């Protein structure tokens, strides 16, 4: 499957894509406007969601069709934007995540535990790849702001 982990500053995902007993690497994070979308699950449904999100119209009927045409547990979307973290559930509705970090996918529990112990989303996904054969390195990372600006802001400079 996949591992996606996010905090309020960055989002990370493994790049392993599995098809039966084969695997290859592909991006799972997509920057669209001020949002970064992380996709997990059925590849066709995930890419259909990304295209829907890129559309200036974002027709809600098209979104419902994307989710209806697939098993509700086969598409997981995490959105990181300046307002926080959203999880698009299997019904196609975004849920705001109130915690400081979030993880989803087959390695999601391992990534959550790693972040509870202070690891970054990138480190958490890398740790999850060691425990989950369906997730694999390299890890893709996207920041809302350039990392240098984020670190300066944290130090109060």
Residue ranges and their predicted role:
Residues 1-75, 80-83, 91-123, 146-152:
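Conserved short S/T/G-enriched processing/targeting/catalytic segments and their helical context
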Residues 126-155:
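Charged phosphate-binding loop/patch that engages nucleotide di/tri-phosphates or the phosphate backbone
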């Amino acid at each position: 499957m996949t591992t996606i982990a996010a905090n309020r500053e960055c989002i990370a995902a493994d790049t392993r894509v599995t098809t039966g007993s084969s695997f290859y690497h592909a991006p799972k994070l997509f920057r669209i406007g001020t949002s970064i979308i992380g996709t997990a699950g059925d590849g066709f449904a995930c890419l259909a969601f990304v295209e829907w999100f890129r559309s200036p119209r974002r027709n809600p009927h098209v979104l419902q069709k994307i989710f209806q045409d697939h098993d509700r547990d086969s598409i997981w979307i995490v959105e990181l934007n300046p307002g926080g973290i959203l999880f698009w559930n299997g019904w196609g509705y975004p849920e705001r995540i109130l915690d400081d970090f979030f993880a989803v996918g087959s390695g999601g529990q391992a990534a959550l535990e790693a972040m509870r112990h202070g690891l970054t989303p990138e480190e958490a996904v890398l740790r999850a790849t060691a425990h989950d054969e369906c997730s694999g390195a390299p890890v893709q990372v996207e920041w809302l702001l350039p990392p240098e600006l984020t670190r300066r802001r944290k130090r109060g400079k």
